[in-house]
UniProtKB/Swiss-Prot annotation:
Catalytic activity annotation: Exolytic cleavage of the (1->4)-beta-glycosidic linkage between N-acetylmuramic acid (MurNAc) and N-acetylglucosamine (GlcNAc) residues in peptidoglycan, from either the reducing or the non-reducing ends of the peptidoglycan chains, with concomitant formation of a 1,6-anhydrobond in the MurNAc residue
Compartments where found: Cell outer membrane
UniProt xrefs under InterPro entries: Lysozyme-like_dom_sf (IPR023346), MltF (IPR023703), Solute-binding_3/MltF_N (IPR001638), Transglyc_AS (IPR000189), Transglycosylase_SLT_dom_1 (IPR008258)
Protein name (Swiss-Prot/TrEMBL): Membrane-bound lytic murein transglycosylase F
Species name: Shigella flexneri serotype 5b (strain 8401)
GO cellular component: cell outer membrane
UniProt-annotated catalytic positions: 314
Length: 518
């Protein structure tokens, strides 16, 4: 899978071109007969999106997601409320623009020449490639040449249809495919892993997130190079909304907010390990139910699933784990650390988890207040792994190399330098295994994403099964019937959504909805 990168050069070029084209519309506040004025008079920004792990999602009634968070900030920027409409597929999104039911599409849509003929793009904010996926263990095609409509299905309105048509005309005349008008890319990927479909095409970011929950989904080949992702608005001669978006993205880019939001949702990396993910999810089923009460009991300010991910990274949930360096137990504490925390038996799971949380809280308390709230945990975890003094060195090195010491995205890139003599020889606390701290935090983020998504998938499946059973037993409530027939519903039920501060969930919804956000 290609490494994700934020295309700031593309943003800059597009911003310059938009500025020239939109100059007559600036300033755009105060005019009474333009799109921005209409939005402000209405008091709400109407945004259409789709339900995916990255763009928009909800847990315990709280919305989140990369596109949602950016759209909410844009609505705040305009001084209006955000009204979100969730559609089932991309075709329905563009129908909303065509019919005047949306001001903006914020759904991880790819910029391409066909779309910009009819719709106005915003500055772009990340990039993806389109990839063909299949189920592990099934035939992996090495080319598109022989694929037929019986094998390949894509979502309606998918940008890749234009690419497929070009490939058919220029390279693969036998290529054919089917468009499923009722399903989006996420549902088609589900069909692939369930054996209902041979192949589909989705973007690289969506695939990477999907694999955290369904490691049996594999990438066969790349269909396109990286393509910039953008929002779309109507192309009708009124450029005031585009001018506002230009100003908004420029401001977000300049003050570092855009980079922080991207780090929050895209910063977990795209390196996928099938065996490791499968092993982890098996442990979720086999081991986690016994440990969950302890994680919930001691998690306190952090989400218990994040604590579980930390413990798995430390010991694979093995209370007897021991390393050659002498650290032991569920949270792999050193003897000195354990003594300072009053732990008498490092191999006692409850003592280890309790002590590990207290040690992590100590690291959290030392993180400077200038670090954004949703990034403090990553600084603390790096300090937990390599020591707080070395975290101070990493921040100092980041500042010396013209990075932002309060940005995890900037600091984590300097962590591997702590083991390189030209750098550590000039630092206060010297050599550190910074590359290990980098991998440590990244792995925890991946495990947390997998855990949250996997538990939600299980809960969704159990709820659907309970609802089906309720049709046969109408006198019994679906909830009680579900708990009776599926006892693990009690294990899956959640009472907290604190993890929203740190990472996106992976619930794939099939239903459209509409809501307002203040």
């Amino acid at each position: 899978m290609k490494k994700l990168k934020i295309n700031y050069l593309f943003i800059g070029i597009l911003a310059l071109l938009l500025a020239v084209a939109l100059w007559p519309s600036i300033p755009w506040f105060g005019k009474a007969d333009n799109r921005i004025a209409a939005i402000q008079a209405r008091g709400e920004l109407r945004v259409s999106t789709i339900h995916t792990p990255l763009t928009y999602n909800k847990i315990n009634g709280k919305p989140f997601g990369l596109d949602y968070e950016l759209a909410k900030q844009f609505a705040d920027y305009l001084g209006v409320k955000l009204k979100v409409t969730v559609r089932q597929n991309i075709s329905q999104l563009f129908d909303d623009l065509d019919n005047g039911n949306a001001d903006l599409l914020a759904a991880g849509l790819v910029y391409n020449s066909e779309r910009v003929k009819n719709y106005q793009p915003s500055p772009t904010y990340y990039s993806v490639s389109q990839q063909l996926v299949y189920k592990v263990g099934q035939y992996r095609p090495r080319t598109l040449g022989n694929l037929t409509a019986e094998q390949l299905t894509v979502a309606p309105g998918h940008v890749v249809v234009n690419d497929l048509q070009t490939l058919k005309e220029t390279k693969f005349p036998e290529l054919s495919w089917k468009v499923d008008d009722k399903k989006g890319s996420a549902e088609l990927m589900e069909d692939v892993i369930e054996g209902k479909l041979d192949y589909t095409i989705a973007d690289s970011v969506a695939i990477s997130l999907f694999q955290r929950v369904h490691p049996e989904l594999a990438v066969a080949l790349d269909i396109t190079d990286e393509q910039p992702v953008t929002w779309f608005s109507p192309l009708d001669g009124d450029n005031t909304l585009s001018a506002a978006l230009l100003d908004f993205f420029n401001e977000m880019n300049e003050d570092g907010t855009l980079a922080r939001i991207e780090e929050k949702y895209l910063g977990h990396g795209d390196d996928f390990d099938y065996v490791d993910t499968r092993t982890f999810l098996r442990a979720v089923d086999a081991v986690l139910p016994q440990l969950k009460p302890l994680f919930e009991k001691y998690a306190e300010e952090i989400d218990w699933r994040l604590l579980a991910a930390i413990a798995y990274q430390e010991s694979h949930w093995d209370a007897q784990a021991t390393s050659p360096t002498g650290v032991r137990g569920m949270m792999m504490l050193t003897k000195n650390t354990a003594q300072s925390l009053g732990i008498t038996d490092r191999t006692d799971a409850e003592q280890s988890i309790s002590g590990g949380v207290r040690y992590l809280q100590d690291m959290m308390s030392k993180v400077p207040e200038s670090v954004p709230e949703n990034e403090r945990i990553w600084f603390a975890l790096a300090a937990y792994n390599m020591g707080y003094a070395h975290m101070l060195d990493a921040r100092a090195l980041t500042a010396k190399t013209k990075g932002n010491p309060d940005s995890w995205a900037d600091v984590k890139q300097r962590l591997p330098l702590l083991s390189q003599k030209p750098y550590y020889s000039k630092l206060t606390y010297g050599y550190a295994r910074g590359h290990e701290a980098y991998a440590y935090v990244e792995n925890i983020r991946k495990y947390q994403i997998s855990l949250v998504g996997y538990l939600q998938e299980k809960e969704k499946q159990a709820t659907e099964a309970a609802m089906q059973l309720a049709q046969d037993y109408p006198a019994v409530s679906p909830t009680e019937l579900g708990k009776e027939k599926f006892p693990f519903l009690s294990f899956l039920s959640q009472s907290s959504s604190n993890y929203l501060t740190h990472s996106p969930s992976l619930l794939f919804s099939r239903k459209g909805s509409e809501e307002k956000q203040n």
